[in-house]
Curated annotation (Swiss-Prot):
SUPFAM superfamilies: ClpS-like (SSF54736), Ribosomal protein L7/12, oligomerisation (N-terminal) domain (SSF48300). It comes from Chlorobaculum tepidum (strain ATCC 49652 / DSM 12025 / NBRC 103806 / TLS). This is Large ribosomal subunit protein bL12. The keyword Ribonucleoprotein applies. CDD domains: Ribosomal_L7_L12.
Length: 126
């Protein structure tokens, strides 16, 4: 196995928290950002088609705004939705606001939001 393949395998074994820490460390070491670059043409075209884009939105992000009073139930639901371990799910809930799911269909986003709200969480769809 080449060193790159070995590195990819090792990175694949990291937990979500460890991967996040790795990204932060790389950003600091090399002075870069993991945020996607925005193209100038896309920025220029956005204001003109913004109203149409809002109506045609097909993918939504489910954002956990706060856990509310029943944090344990919210952690259980976050674990079920994301497949995270107990510690990672607890860290996500404690660190709210956090994105629970990204780029899901409207139906799935509403279903996830309902599950979280039923558990006592405050949720937002973006």
């Amino acid at each position: 196995m080449s060193s790159i393949e070995t590195l990819v395998e090792e990175i694949g074994k990291l937990t979500l928290t460890e991967a996040s820490e790795l990204v932060k460390a790389l950003e600091e070491k090399f002075g870069v950002s993991a945020a996607p670059a925005v193209m100038a043409g896309a920025v220029m075209a956005a204001p003109a088609g913004e109203a149409a884009a809002a109506e045609e939105k097909t993918e939504f992000d489910v954002v956990l705004k706060s856990a509310g009073a029943n944090k344990i139930n919210v952690i259980k639901v976050v674990r079920a939705i994301t497949g995270l371990g107990l510690k990672e799910a607890k860290d996500m809930v404690d660190g709210a606001p956090k994105t629970v799911k990204e780029a899901v269909s409207k139906d799935e986003a509403e279903k996830i939001a309902k599950e979280l709200k039923d558990a006592g969480a405050e949720v937002e769809l973006n």
